[in-house]
Amino acid sequence: MPGVRYLLLGRLGYLAMKIPVKLTCINGLLLLVAVFSGGPVHAQQQVQPGYLAPADSLHIESWLPPPPAEDSLPNAADVEAYLQSRSLIGTARAEEAHADDVVKPAEAVAPRFSYILGVTLDRRNAPRLMRMMDLVRSDAEWVVLPVKKAVTSGGRRRPFVDFPNLPKCPLVYDALGTTGSYPSGHAMTGWLWGSILAEIAPGYADALFARGEAFGDSRVVCGFHYPSDVAAGRLVASALLARLHADPRFRSDLAEAKKEIATLLARRAQ
């Protein structure tokens, strides 16, 4: 999509901010208290447990680059890409972006990808896949907490906040106005779904990766994120998936999910 995708160069050399965290467990929930310079994003934030224990999870604050500085060339490129993408509002691409405004539970996200396979993915047809993707989403939420800073704590403003009078998708924006834009959690979700389904059904890999990419790009179209937010989300998703492959529970669920999808595809072919 011209004006939305561009290659980010020369940013991986930045040092990520170190963020101290305090972790406790209450009623089976992971409770994270993150202390950021400039004030906390949230005093407390609860995340459902996924596959990875906190000590075994990624610590992306040690390697993920910060968002572009406001006076930097990468930020100028972000803004230009966003402004160009305003021409998509009112088109079929914007309608697709509106429909992509889902992130969980798995059954809500599945239809954005399952049409590529030509099967229905839900808790009746693919219970292990649905459970697996919900757990993966929890891992994604956990891993991004240390860097997902609120605007009041120095987090990056979202495009619709920077340009409130420009056209955007007919969605509810107010709740996200004070939350940080970087990195994009939806882009993480899209890339995880595309990557995992491509591994499960490799014959559809190209279309699934394209859908996962478009799912993240939709956040630019609707004004929730800049392109570098989306790129960072995909980077974190790829790293998280690599880490998950070292977890035996994830590998076991993935193997069972492959069987579920193989059965559905075989049934469809009859």
Residues covered by each model-derived region:
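Bacterial N-terminal signal peptides that target proteins for export
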Residues: K18-G28
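Bacterial N-terminal signal peptides
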Residues: I26-S37
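Sec/Tat signal peptide C-region and signal peptidase I cleavage site
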Residues: G39-A43
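Acidic, carboxylate-rich catalytic segments that either coordinate divalent cations
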Residues: H245-Q270
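Interfacial helix-loop-helix junctions of multi-pass membrane proteins
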Residues: F215-H245
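Hydrophobic alpha-helical bundle signature of multipass membrane enzymes
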Residues: Q45-V221, D253
